[in-house]
Every structure is written in C-alpha cells, then in structure tokens.
A protein has these predicted regions:
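Acidic (Asp/Glu-rich) sequence patches and key acidic residues
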Residues: 1-138
Length: 138
C-alpha cells in the first residue's frame, strides 16, 4: 500500500427527506459534527430556511485521523459504514457518500487493496476523491 506523506479528510455525508440524524446517532452511536433534522431552521448564508431534508456529516475520531498512516481513518469509515449502513438507511438516509479529500504538498499516488475495494463496493455508495495542494502558509 502506498502511503502519502500528507493527510486525508474523510467526511461521510448523509441526507434524505425522512432522515433523522438524532435517531441515527442514537441507534448507531455515530457522533455527527453537523446535523439538521427535517423541519429545523437552517442558516444558508444570510437567509433562514426550513430544512426540507435531514442531513448530517461525520468523520473518523481523531485517534484514527492523527496517525502516520492516513489510510487508518478511511478503513475506520468503511468498517463503520459496513456495520451501520442498514440502520442509517432505516433512519431515512437515502443518499450516503464518502468525500475523500487528499491534502498534499506534492503529487500523490493512492493505492487501494482489492479487499478494501470490495468492502467499498458492497456499501453501494458514491466515493468521491478530491486533491488539494497545501501551501506553506496553510
């Protein structure tokens, strides 16, 4: 496995017109860092709107992100979703996706083992990958 010298950002986003982040968190133990229930007031820029969909986001706990191997957090995310995907869907999460951000000073080569790719494929969710160049002042 090729390990980049920099870091990953690994948020998972969930949403749906009947999705309840509170129920999902209660049933799975997942701690969302951002969540909105259907019907709550949302601040969108300077406007306030009533949320038509429930949505939430979560990331691996810090101990899985702050390691020499940035893949550890990604493995945690896949394992957590594998364990809880049915419960999240039963709580109304119709749309679930992982948005991997790779932050680097240089070019990065990502390498995924077949077992990891099979686990990811079995989730049947989108997996987005974006690259970001970190400059000296960041």
């Amino acid at each position: 496995m090729n390990i980049p010298s920099d870091r990953f950002m690994i948020p998972c986003h969930l949403m749906g017109p009947h999705f309840s982040p509170c129920a999902a968190s209660e049933k799975t133990g997942i701690q969302f860092y951002k969540q909105t229930e259907v019907g709550e007031i949302e601040h969108i820029g300077k406007r306030k709107e009533i949320a038509k969909v429930g949505h939430a986001s979560f990331e691996p706990p810090l101990e899985f992100q702050q390691t020499e191997n940035p893949y550890i957090g990604l493995f945690w995310m896949i394992d957590t979703l594998t364990e809880h995907i049915d419960t999240l869907r039963s709580c109304g999460a119709d749309d679930i996706w992982i948005d991997l951000g790779v932050v680097s000073h240089l070019d990065v080569k990502l390498e995924f083992e077949p077992d990891f790719l099979m686990k990811l494929a079995n989730l049947k969710i989108p997996f987005l990958i974006s690259g970001y160049i970190e400059t000296a002042d960041e």
